[in-house]
Amino acid sequence: MKGKSDVMRTLAFAGGDKYVGEWSDGKENGHGTYAFVGGDKYVGDWRDSKRNGRGTQTYSDGGSYVGEWRDDKKHGRGTQTYSDGSSYAGEFRNDKRNGQGTLRWANGDKYVGEWRDNKENGQGTYVFADGDKYVGEVSDRKRNGRGTETYSDGREYVGEWTDGKRNGQGTLSRPNGQNYVGEFKDDLQSGQGTITWPNGQKYVGEFEDDKPNGQGTYSFPGGAKYVGEVKDGFYDGQGIYTSTEGWTQSGLWNRGKFVKADSSPGGNAHQ
């Protein structure tokens, strides 16, 4: 049943806005076009003088929204394009990106996943223009929680993230067969960890700034071993090297070279 005075109306408002469309019960009801004085424009469904249903809004900055509305807010499914060239397709709630959706940036990056209050939050996938890809937990537009990133150079990281960086426990695999398992800090190998090489060599110990630093143990396929202090990956400081033949060098090392034997008897048993 039609409402009272269900007619087409053209209304010009004191502030400069203009409405052309269906009118009933003294309100915008039905289908109509509303031109805002600032340059925005809405074409679509109305109920009780508010945008309700499906409609298209174009903005003065060149952006647009096509989709569902409730009480003058984007609510439901829709597609929004922005003046910077990016676009979002998915769910909205109370005028914000909420739920499942896909955002494509002008530079070619893409995010597919969960949203909360206009931010990437929950489970999602980032696909970057440079070929990198992240799948995992996201909060406040950053990789946070557990996730897997595959890099364009063939590396893969599986583990914990904080504020978009590798932080916590994780595994970094390289295409040459080298693998690191252990702690990370601000994208770098830092803390306790283990590196294995494809030739069977292994290092277990402390890391800092992406390199073995501190106390650690190198072991080699033939049975040789170094136990002691390391710096930037080199034997450096006090340490004991045991060869495959069984002889040892115990003492001070510098940049991988043995420089001084222990003063105690038997400190250097190299024969």
Predicted feature residues:
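Threonine-centered tandem repeat motifs in low-complexity domains
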Residues: T10, S24-N29, T33, K50, ...
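Aromatic (phenylalanine/tyrosine) cluster motif
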Residues: F13, Y34-F36, Y59, Y82, ...
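Acidic, Ala/Val/Gly-enriched low-complexity intrinsically disordered segments
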Residues: D6-V7, A106, V127, E156
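Terminal, low-structured helical/coil segments at or just beyond the last alpha-helical repeat
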Residues: K257-Q271
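N-terminal leader/linker segments that initiate helical-solenoid repeat arrays
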Residues: M1-K4, A14, S264-P265
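Conserved anchor residues at repeat-unit boundaries in beta-strand-based tandem repeats, strongest
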Residues: M1-S5, K18-N29, K41-N52, Y65-H75, ...
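Acidic, proline/serine/threonine- and glycine-rich low-complexity intrinsically disordered segments
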Residues: S5-D6, H270
